[in-house]
Amino acid sequence: MNILLSNDDGIMSPGIITLKTYLQQKHDVYVVAPDIERSATGHGITVRNPLWAKKVKFGDTFFGHAVNGTPADCVKIGLDAIYKDIHFDVVISGINRGANLGTDVLYSGTVSAALEGAVGGYPSIAVSCVDFSNPNFEDGAKVVLNILEKLDLNNWPEFTTLNVNIPKIPYDEMKGIKITKQSRRRYQDYFEERKDPFGNSYYWMLGNIIEDDNDDNSDYNVINQGYVAVTPLSVFMTKYDFIDELKSWLEV
């Protein structure tokens, strides 16, 4: 199959290099990724500045196109310009260094790149290794290959992305795959005021993870049980169970 591959850690990050290495054993892989790390850029796109897409080699071999934009930019320009004549079967983003659980998906460039694929009408998958300090991207790539072999891409629901999180254990110790829902995992942020060498104030964001009550089927709990967590996400965010009550407040 034809795969468009992107990420938010940058085109020369170990996660995307490893994933391409594994995927291209069975598939045709086309890489369009940010020229530098663009983590936590969300779903921003570039509208008032030019985008450059430069060909990049890994060793002596062409690897992909590096774009001076966001992860969502990369998917857009990959689908609609650089490889507009290619019929892609799936868009994959990753492998990310660190988890994308709960509200992480709102900020994640990794997830946003995959969601941009969904906006364009393509099946899409975001992949993250929960282990930030020492992620095993080879194990992550094995998980992706396993998932791809099982998916029915011809019966994919519209505007849908799979958010895949891989636990911090060796591949052979993973218990399997579980379909999950987003956890109520968020952050309590605070800003530490500091001084630069010239005495000017600047702020550094820090924070603590808040784990609200989560059932056993949340992405966070499933990961901690030793399973790969696969959460289907939709491009559309309407809160349907609030519509009727909101009408009673405002449509009067």
Curated annotation (Swiss-Prot):
This is 5'-nucleotidase SurE. It is found in: Cytoplasm. Pfam families: SurE (PF01975). Belongs to the SurE nucleotidase family. A divalent metal cation binds at residues 8-9, 39, 96. It catalyses: a ribonucleoside 5'-phosphate + H2O = a ribonucleoside + phosphate. It comes from Petrotoga mobilis (strain DSM 10674 / SJ95). GO terms for molecular function: 3'-nucleotidase activity; 5'-nucleotidase activity; exopolyphosphatase activity; metal ion binding; nucleotide binding. The gene is surE. SUPFAM superfamilies: SurE-like (SSF64167). Keywords: Cytoplasm, Hydrolase, Metal-binding, Nucleotide-binding. PANTHER family: 5'-NUCLEOTIDASE SURE, 5'_3'-NUCLEOTIDASE SURE. Its EC number is 3.1.3.5. It comes from the Bacteria.
